[in-house]
């Protein structure tokens, strides 16, 4: 029998995409509906998603990581039987929040008109990765970032190191150096923390250009643990984003006073404080 108040949301993608889907679910819960998540994508397409032919040094999975970063929030997973029953109520409408259950939400059209700034403000106090309980190295780095004048720099490479149909051209070296220069002009004694899925590239192309600046290239996480980069970035006083979405996700879960520097337009930026957009044009090869 169908639950007339149940909404099922099909989730896919990396940790920031998952955050979008999860936040959408929270908005439905505010309407008094029950929400479950279809995570079958991770069991199928997510296995080996990050591969050598996509620019990674080895094969990595994309996992369902929301429960790992919000362990104290209630999350329900849809059964395969429920998924099959609700698929006939599927929608990919941009106006999905106006739809009423029974409902099965698929795709990314929902994000066109979705503003999750407020809901992220509500859940960010619950953003405590389980790894903090079991890994002292992670805990200590987080405490160091909170203690220092920290600037987190996210450098997305891997599958986005070449021009991408959805993300466009990759942010180039000049963009990151310009942003770092701006930060250094604004604040003295800043410490840079680099988070990337290609540390070798960062060490060869960025670090040699910023001699004399205190910096750390984090090696705590792998591409399979992007949620840790999201956590560390959210703790930084300043976040420098790339053409990927990690920096924006970190800003959503950070404190209001955190400065976010980005090359990427997003309508939600107008609902936030302390935003700096840097216009840039990647150099042609």
Indicate residue ranges for each PLM-predicted region.
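A short, glycine/small-residue-rich beta-strand->loop->alpha-helix junction that serves as a flexible
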Residues: 11-20
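A short acidic (Asp/Glu
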Residues: 20, 46-50, 164, 202-206, ...
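Extreme N-terminal starter segment of soluble prokaryotic enzymes
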Residues: 2-8
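A structural signal for isolated positions on well-ordered beta-strands in alpha/beta enzyme cores
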Residues: 8, 36, 152, 191-193
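Donor-binding and catalytic core of enzymes assembling or modifying cell-surface/extracellular glycoconjugates
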Residues: 15, 185-278
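Secretory-pathway luminal glycosyltransferase catalytic domains
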Residues: 5, 46-187, 285
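A short beta-strand-loop structural module common to alpha/beta enzyme folds
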Residues: 34-45
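Short amphipathic alpha-helix
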Residues: 20-28
């Amino acid at each position: 029998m169908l639950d007339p108040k149940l909404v099922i949301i099909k989730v896919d993608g990396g940790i920031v995409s998952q955050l979008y889907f999860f936040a959408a679910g929270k908005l439905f819960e505010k309407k008094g509906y029950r929400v479950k998540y279809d995570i079958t994508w991770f069991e199928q397409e997510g296995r080996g998603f990050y591969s050598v032919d996509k620019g990674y040094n080895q094969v990595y999975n994309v996992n369902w990581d929301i429960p790992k970063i919000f362990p104290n929030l209630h999350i329900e997973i849809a059964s395969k039987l429920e998924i099959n029953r609700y698929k006939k109520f599927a929608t990919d409408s941009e106006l999905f929040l106006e739809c009423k259950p029974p409902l099965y939400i698929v795709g990314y059209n929902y994000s066109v008109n979705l503003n999750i700034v407020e809901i992220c403000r509500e859940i960010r106090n619950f953003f405590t990765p389980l790894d903090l309980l079991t890994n002292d190295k992670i805990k200590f780095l987080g405490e160091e970032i909170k203690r220092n004048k920290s600037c987190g720099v996210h450098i997305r490479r891997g599958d986005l190191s070449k021009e991408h149909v959805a993300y466009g051209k990759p942010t180039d070296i000049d963009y990151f150096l310009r942003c770092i220069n701006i930060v250094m002009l604004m604040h003295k004694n800043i410490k840079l923390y680099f988070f990337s899925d290609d540390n070798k590239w960062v060490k060869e192309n960025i670090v040699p250009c910023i001699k004399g600046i205190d910096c750390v290239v984090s090696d705590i996480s792998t591409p399979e643990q992007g949620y840790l980069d999201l956590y560390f970035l959210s703790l930084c006083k300043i976040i420098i984003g790339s053409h990927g979405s990690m920096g924006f996700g970190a800003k959503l879960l950070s404190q209001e006073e955190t400065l976010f520097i980005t090359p990427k337009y997003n309508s939600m930026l107008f609902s936030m404080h302390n935003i700096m957009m840097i216009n840039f044009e990647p150099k042609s090869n």
